[in-house]
């Protein structure tokens, strides 16, 4: 029998604020929504951000800053990054509590309406301190907000038209309704998701394999395990590899049958009568990155719970981006430890994974904590980018050739365009 995680916030079904049509908006005040917030509003509308029915009210916003949670029916539910809608001071002045406003895309199309709860000023220093845990602002996460000229926030409830996804990998993106239906259809007794914003090298890939095998050992005698490579394909910082290229690498990895090759425990899977390659699916999640470390790890878990996933993998430096001087904002495993400190309810279970590397003595990837004293094969991130950028194939013990080839083609095209 399928086991699907309950919707966050105590709801029986994911929030659904998608409508077929909108009333006339010609006379309504307008809120221009940038591409990033457009995506967030659609994730609210499709239930990925349940129990929200719109951008956060001031009461919810303040609750997240103070308690790392939102209250529903007298109960606190885990939530670590406030999600109100940024607006300009001029837009805020035109909004009235209890009345609708039109949501307008950057291209000028009205895509939804917001019934206003209230507009309020945006205390960015307080926001940054609560989310990132530091008053320093020399890091990518802080710049997301400090570079935004908007000074106010608004909360309320939304109704939006369905988004017409046009990217080439649109069939590989799953939303709460479709993912939950898939989990039930496949009869997964447990499921595990791995979050990434990067192309995978084998140590990354092993985190997914490890999480799947840990779950398999726990429930594999009685339950079929669903395994999901669940990358974010929303807005990222400029030096991250674009979503289309990353998705191509993931497709090569999974459709090519390379997942876990040489690193998985073949005997374990065989003994449970299950198959990692057949049970692993690629499911993109169209949501932005906040580069928020531990705070974002909790949000990532909430997204997956709303998708219906039962277990979520948390590795080292989850959602991490250091200070500009390369010093660390958070400890390597702070994103794992935050789940032990949450006061709000969160039903999805986490699977913690430590450092992994290819070990010469083993002939495959394993956990560093279990293989102390053995010889690792590794390439630094900067060296890896340098090799791929120059068209040099990295060591296959570090990155699979199918993944590397996609990236080398990407950098070659990028370099050619830059010199044209």
Curated annotation (Swiss-Prot):
Entry GO MF terms: ATP binding; sulfate adenylyltransferase (ATP) activity
Family matches, as CDD domains: ATPS (cd00517)
Cofactor(s) required, per the database record: Mg(2+)
Reactions it catalyzes: sulfate + ATP + H(+) = adenosine 5'-phosphosulfate + diphosphate
GO terms classed as biological process: cysteine biosynthetic process; hydrogen sulfide biosynthetic process; methionine biosynthetic process; sulfate assimilation
Any Pfam family matching the protein: PUA_2
InterPro entries linked to this entry: ATP-Sase_PUA-like_dom, PUA-like_sf, Rossmann-like_a/b/a_fold, Sulfurylase_cat_dom, Sulphate_adenylyltransferase
Enzyme Commission number: 2.7.7.4
Regulation: Inhibited by adenosine 5'-phosphosulfate (APS), but not by 3'phosphoadenosine 5'-phosphosulfate (PAPS). Inhibited by AMP, ADP, CTP, GTP, ITP, UTP and anions other than those in group IV.
Positions carrying N-acetylalanine: 2
Temperature dependence comment: Optimum temperature is 37 degrees Celsius.
Biological pathway: Sulfur metabolism; hydrogen sulfide biosynthesis; sulfite from sulfate: step 1/3
Record keywords: Acetylation, Amino-acid biosynthesis, ATP-binding, Cysteine biosynthesis, Magnesium, Methionine biosynthesis, Nucleotide-binding, Nucleotidyltransferase, Transferase
pH-activity relationship: Optimum pH is 8.2.
UniProt similarity note: Belongs to the sulfate adenylyltransferase family.
Protein name: Sulfate adenylyltransferase
Source organism: Pyropia yezoensis
């Amino acid at each position: 029998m399928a086991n699907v995680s309950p919707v966050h916030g105590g709801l029986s079904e994911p929030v659904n604020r998608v409508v077929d049509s909108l009333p006339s908006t010609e006379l309504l005040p307008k809120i221009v929504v940038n591409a990033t917030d457009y995506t967030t509003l659609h994730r609210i509308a499709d239930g990925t951000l349940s129990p929200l029915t719109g951008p956060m009210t001031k009461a919810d916003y303040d609750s997240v800053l103070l308690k790392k949670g939102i209250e529903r029916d007298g109960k606190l539910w885990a939530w670590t990054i406030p999600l109100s809608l940024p607006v300009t001071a001029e837009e805020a002045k035109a909004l009235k509590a209890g009345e609708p406003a039109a949501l307008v895309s950057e291209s000028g199309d009205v895509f939804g309406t917001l019934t206003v709860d209230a507009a309020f000023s945006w205390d960015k220093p307080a926001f940054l301190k609560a989310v990132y845990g530091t008053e320093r602002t020399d890091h990518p996460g802080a710049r997301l907000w400090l570079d935004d000229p908007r000074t106010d926030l608004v909360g309320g409830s939304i109704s939006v038209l369905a988004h017409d996804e046009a990217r080439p990998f649109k069939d590989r993106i799953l939303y709460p309704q479709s993912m939950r239906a898939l989990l039930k259809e496949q009869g997964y007794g447990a499921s595990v998701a791995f979050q990434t914003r990067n192309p995978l090298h084998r140590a990354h890939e092993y985190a997914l394999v490890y999480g799947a095998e840990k779950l398999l050992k726990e429930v594999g005698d009685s339950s079929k395990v669903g395994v999901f490579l669940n990358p974010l394909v929303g807005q990222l910082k400029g030096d991250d590899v674009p979503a289309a290229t990353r998705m191509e690498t993931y497709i090569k990895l999974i459709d090519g049958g390379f997942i876990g090759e040489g690193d998985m425990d073949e005997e374990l899977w065989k003994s449970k009568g299950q198959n990692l390659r057949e049970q692993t699916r690629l499911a993109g999640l169209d949501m932005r990155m906040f580069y928020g470390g531990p705070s974002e790890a909790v949000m990532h878990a909430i997204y997956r719970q709303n998708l219906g996933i039962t277990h979520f993998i948390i590795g080292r430096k989850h959602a991490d981006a250091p200070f500009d001087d390369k010093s660390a904002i958070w400890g390597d495993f702070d994103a794992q430890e935050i789940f032990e400190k949450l006061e709000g309810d969160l039903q999805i279970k986490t699977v913690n994974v430590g450092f992994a590397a290819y070990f010469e003595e083993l002939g495959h990837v394993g956990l560093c904590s279990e293989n102390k004293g053995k010889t690792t094969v590794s390439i630094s991130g900067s060296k890896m980018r340098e090799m791929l950028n120059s068209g040099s194939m990295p060591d296959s013990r570090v990155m699979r050739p199918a993944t590397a080839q996609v990236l080398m083609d990407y950098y070659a095209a990028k370099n050619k365009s830059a010199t044209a």
